[in-house]
């Protein structure tokens, strides 16, 4: 492996081209501010033949490398501005083009309608950007369903995995969500509200150190003048054979969505609201071998879900130096679920049925969340020196009531009631100081405080059981400071950073302290980028990360899933630390090839299984060292002018080594994941889209999960001058997204199969109204 890395580094970083001349320049607007995204064309003077093209960076910079001697013309285009031209001559020397100042085009500003289409994938120095907006297969979906279509992301049992790693931090508009039930938030968020998703596999010092990787979901925000908005409605139904698929009804969804934006002068206001009604199911089978007997279980869990979410805010552009913002968002979620469990105890040697019993679990869930933010951005001058201050406050309330009735030789009645309020506040400060256009220093600090109460009342035959009831109070205060230094030298760019975090965590159960921690940790990071040519670039990354145990994992209470299964928290688990390395090669800012290596210590096994007589329970444990290696190869699927898309492969190696239950658990496994998305546009206004993924069997802690996949197809038509859009989606056409697997370790022998409501058809309509022009 060391030889491979050495050869790969040498072959990529020391590729050089024969020509040496470089053309550089910078683009400013009429207020002397750097312009990002201006189209810069390098043309031959004699016949205007296109030589190369580029987009100006965030600092307004552009460059062309390896240019032959000759006479050229640099043309700069930007929507709403007049074209600029500069004539230059290259004669074996580097050329610095005079700064280009764009002049507004008053005529075009009133006539241009924004119709540009972004590529689905964009590779940037520190992240992969997935442009969800405009995707046909995303129409009518939830955010959780959209994540399943993102390259390298898998969602298993509502748990998000990225490149084989399950320690993933989900953020919404850069805001943390670690104290909310993020799977429920994403499961009720309309995809119509999402602009793009950022995958940050090796976050820098500016980001929280928590989590092995970051998935940042960015909400749409319109900056057009006047009043504009979008209204949409999505409906869908499941496609199942009642007898064959084990369901007793049809399943459907309804999801209306409305967003409005108004910008006049210095004030921009916006808001959105969505409603989501869905009924769905989960069907599972378990086969447990315990001594000489087998327990065969089936669980059928139909449920009805209702939720609504809202978002409102305003940005005030007070002057050229100060911008103030405020917003509030929230959601309400309710679910009624009735799980029917049937268990047979069978003699393993003869197959004779020894006993049969059934369990009915009626669960009512209610979740409420409200979050508010105020922010201020101050630009000290036009060089990019700025200060950002953010304050966030949110509350989250979970109520869960479960009635569990088991019918065997006699009938038992159990009841679990959970009351779980959460309060969370964050104050963050970020400062950026560019010394010049090639050198920049960033620094900042952050403090957060979470106060959580988890109150559980357990009753048996309507009598409170004090031994199983608990009141777990938890608080977590995280303080952080960071600094990051960025430098560009010719075709090289490096970023190095250091983040220091203090964690103060306290927990007590029924007035007894079970947790009291106070510690500091350092998290270095480094990025090295080289632009090999006008098409190829390479990036080498390193970061240290931490995955802190959640308050649910540290809560020592017992939660019964059925009469034979329960889970229990562990207040003694420690944070896990990981070191992550990644080397990637990009072509025209598209992800092409990468290799990454991750080493994690004190790995938290979230569901470490244990056998207690006929009962099986799981608990979080620090068990293992974990190695993860990922080779990734992506490629475009562009054929002519009508077919476009991408395909990709990931080869993932997971290795766990742990001492558990008196024995050594030492297992490793390779698996292959493939994903694709292809669009066919036979004529303007029509789009046919095919997407999906496939993965071979993989290892997740003690569980070996069998192969699974997904195939989706969508038809989309735009009309009414591109303001209206209708989409018809067929999801999981082959009904192949089924979770199957097994746990075999010492006296634990369990096989399972799980089916969710994934095969469905959806019809979505959206209409953009108001001013769609700049």
Regions of interest found by a model, annotated:
Residues 45-61:
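Short, acidic Ser/Thr/Gly-rich low-complexity loop/linker segments typical of extracellular
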Residues 424-428, 468-470, 475, 574, ...:
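Outer membrane beta-barrel strand-and-loop segments of large Gram-negative receptors
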Residues 33, 41-43, 77-81, 91, ...:
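Short, acidic, small-residue-rich periplasmic hinge/interaction motif at the N-terminus
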Residues 470-476, 546-594, 599, 618-630, ...:
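Outer-membrane beta-barrel signature, preferentially recognizing the C-terminal barrel domain
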Residues 219-236, 280-287, 296-297, 305-312, 397, 504-506, 534-580, 595-613, ...:
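Surface-exposed extracellular loop regions of Gram-negative outer-membrane beta-barrel proteins
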Residues 94-101, 143-146, 184-185, 199, ...:
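N-terminal periplasmic accessory domains that precede
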Residues 65, 176-203:
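Short acidic/polar hinge/loop motifs at secondary-structure boundaries
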């Amino acid at each position: 492996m060391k030889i491979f890395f050495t050869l790969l580094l040498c072959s990529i970083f020391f590729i050089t081209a024969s020509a040496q001349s470089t053309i550089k320049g910078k683009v400013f607007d009429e207020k002397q501010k750097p312009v990002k995204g201006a189209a810069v064309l390098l043309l031959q003077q004699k016949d205007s033949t296109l030589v190369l093209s580029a987009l100006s960076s965030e600092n307004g910079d552009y460059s062309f490398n390896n240019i032959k001697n000759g006479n050229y013309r640099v043309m700069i285009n930007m929507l709403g501005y007049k074209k600029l031209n500069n004539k230059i001559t290259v004669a074996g020397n580097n050329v610095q083009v005079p700064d280009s100042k764009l002049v507004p085009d008053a005529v075009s500003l009133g006539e241009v309608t924004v119709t540009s289409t972004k590529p689905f994938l964009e590779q940037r120095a520190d992240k992969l950007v997935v442009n969800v907006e405009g995707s046909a297969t995303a129409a009518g979906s939830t955010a959780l369903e959209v994540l399943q279509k993102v390259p390298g992301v898998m969602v298993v049992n509502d748990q998000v995995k990225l490149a084989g790693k399950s320690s993933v931090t989900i953020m919404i508009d850069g805001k943390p969500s670690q104290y909310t039930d993020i799977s429920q938030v994403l499961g009720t968020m309309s995809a119509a509200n999402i602009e793009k998703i950022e995958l940050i596999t090796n976050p820098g010092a500016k980001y929280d150190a928590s989590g092995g990787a970051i998935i940042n979901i960015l909400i749409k925000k319109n900056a057009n003048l006047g009043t504009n908005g979008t209204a949409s409605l999505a409906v869908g139904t499941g496609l199942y054979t009642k007898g064959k698929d084990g369901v007793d009804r049809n399943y459907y969804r309804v999801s209306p969505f409305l967003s409005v934006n108004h910008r006049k002068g210095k004030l921009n206001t916006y808001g959105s609201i969505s409603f989501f009604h869905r009924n769905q199911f989960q069907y599972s089978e378990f086969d447990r071998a315990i001594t000489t007997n087998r327990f065969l279980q089936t669980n059928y869990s139909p449920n009805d879900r209702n939720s609504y979410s809202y978002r409102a805010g305003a940005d005030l552009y007070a002057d050229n130096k100060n911008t103030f913002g405020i917003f509030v968002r929230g959601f309400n979620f309710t679910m009624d679920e009735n799980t029917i469990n049937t268990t047979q105890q069978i003699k393993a040697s003869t197959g004779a049925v020894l006993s049969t019993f059934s369990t009915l679990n009626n669960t009512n869930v209610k979740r409420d969340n409200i979050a508010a933010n105020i922010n201020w951005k101050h630009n000290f001058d036009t060089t990019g020196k700025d200060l950002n201050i953010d304050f966030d406050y949110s509350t989250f309330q979970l109520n869960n009531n479960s009635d569990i009735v088991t019918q065997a030789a006699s009938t038992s009645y159990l009841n679990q009631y959970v009351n779980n309020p959460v309060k969370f506040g964050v104050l963050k400060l970020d400062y950026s100081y560019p010394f010049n256009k090639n050198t920049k220093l960033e620094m900042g600090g952050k403090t957060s405080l979470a106060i959580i109460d988890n109150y559980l009342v357990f009753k048996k035959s309507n009598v409170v059981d004090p031994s199983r009831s608990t009141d777990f109070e938890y608080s977590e205060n995280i303080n952080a400071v960071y600094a990051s230094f960025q430098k560009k030298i010719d075709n090289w760019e490096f970023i190095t950073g250091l983040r220091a975090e203090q964690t103060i965590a306290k927990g007590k159960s029924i007035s007894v302290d079970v947790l009291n921690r106070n510690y500091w940790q350092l998290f270095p990071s480094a990025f090295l980028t080289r632009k090999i040519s006008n098409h190829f670039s390479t990036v080498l990354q390193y970061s240290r990360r931490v995955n802190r145990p959640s308050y649910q994992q540290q809560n020592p209470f017992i939660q019964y899933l059925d009469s034979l299964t329960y889970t229990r928290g562990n207040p003694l688990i420690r944070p896990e630390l990981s070191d992550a390395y990644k080397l990637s090669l990009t072509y025209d800012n598209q992800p092409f090839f990468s290799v990454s290596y991750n080493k994690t210590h004190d790995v938290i096994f979230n569901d470490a299984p244990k056998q207690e007589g006929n009962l099986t329970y799981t608990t979080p444990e620090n068990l293992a060292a974990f190695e993860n290696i990922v080779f990734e190869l992506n490629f475009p699927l562009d054929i002519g002018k009508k077919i476009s898309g991408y395909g990709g492969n990931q080869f993932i190696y997971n290795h766990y080594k742990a001492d558990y239950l008196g024995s050594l658990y030492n297992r490793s496994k390779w698996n292959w994941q493939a994903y694709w998305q292809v669009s066919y546009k036979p004529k303007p206004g029509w789009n046919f889209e095919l997407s999906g993924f496939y993965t071979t069997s993989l290892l997740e802690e003690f569980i070996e999960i069998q192969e699974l996949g997904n195939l989706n197809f969508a038809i989309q038509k735009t009309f009414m001058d591109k303001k209206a859009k209708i989409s018809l989606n067929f999801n999981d056409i082959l009904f192949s997204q089924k979770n199957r697997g097994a746990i075999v370790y010492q006296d634990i022998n369990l096989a399972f199969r799980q089916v969710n409501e994934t095969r469905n058809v959806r019809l979505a309509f959206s209409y953009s109204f108001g001013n769609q022009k700049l």
